[in-house]
Amino acid sequence: MRKKEHNKYRSKSIFSDRDKFPVTDENNKGRSFRKTDPLNIALRFIKFRMRSKWEVENKLRKEGFNEETIGQIIQKLVENGLIDDEKFAYLYAYDSLVIHYKGPYRIRYELRQLHVDDYVIEDALKKALSEVDVNEIIEKLTQGLDEKKKREKLYRHGFGGEW
């Protein structure tokens, strides 16, 4: 009886239409339903860090789901704000600058590898670079090195000649 009362008050969530995404025997491969449900796989994949739309699509393709199912899952995740390439690109650029001391050229290259659109990359880089003191990052990165070594290290980390 308690279970029915609980279900009566449940709000609609992104999990409510799971039966729209059929899991066929070819996808099952002996695993439990939880591990073969495309929505569950996508949610577990984005659980630990933000992902680009392409990364999630690629993950679902590797799991063996058809394009129609992948499209439905991606649409649902975008509608619920769980996938947002603009937000992803900004956070990736900001973290790469502040935590990993990567320069704009390297960040741009890595985001292109993740199939983020060029205009989104440029906006994210502008925003991240405006919020970070790049000279401070360069100082930390090249502390105690002679001029030749500084220049080499800056190029390796993705800072161009203008720094």
Each model region followed by its residue ranges:
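An alpha-helical, amphipathic repeat domain used for nucleic-acid recognition
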Residues: 1-163
